[in-house]
Amino acid sequence: HLHEIVCSFLLDAKYGDQLGQFCAVMPIDLETAISPSRERNGEPKKLAQLEFERQGDHVTASVTRQGVTIIEVIGDVTGALAVPAPFPVLQFWYKFLPAVSGEGFDAGPFLVTLHQTMKPETCERVDGKLVLRDLPGTPVADLPVLQLEGARLMMTSSEFFHVLEDVEIDPDQYARHVRVQYT
């Protein structure tokens, strides 16, 4: 079994009356996990180099895709925080099969929800900065960061399951977003 390192870039989202998060991009370092995850669950995984380093209280983390460091965190641990109780996370993913013709879909799109219980083990406050850089097809820098409210370094474990939701997704409305998931 190979171990994958994954980063999730999540945006607050709502579907119907369900509050959750939309995973805009999921950089991963294990190429063989990309296609099966997309095809089975709709996970927006993209190959990237992920790095995390801690030297004493100084931490750095980065996500590099196609030679561009698109996400970078630089900071210092300033103290321990109370370890939160386990908490639920709901993520929205879209699963689809692009059409052979190049126009529209042969199947889907479908809404898949990830129901996850995060179980924090440690939690520390980090003071630092977040840098987002532009890369076509990975639009993290297109999102305005008005203020960094805080950063935490948390070690967690989790339990999760996926649900294929019984809802209709308008294929014409979703088609314009397909390029982002595959580039």
Where in the sequence are the language-model features?
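Aromatic- and glycine-enriched beta-alpha-beta binding-site module
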Residues: 1-78
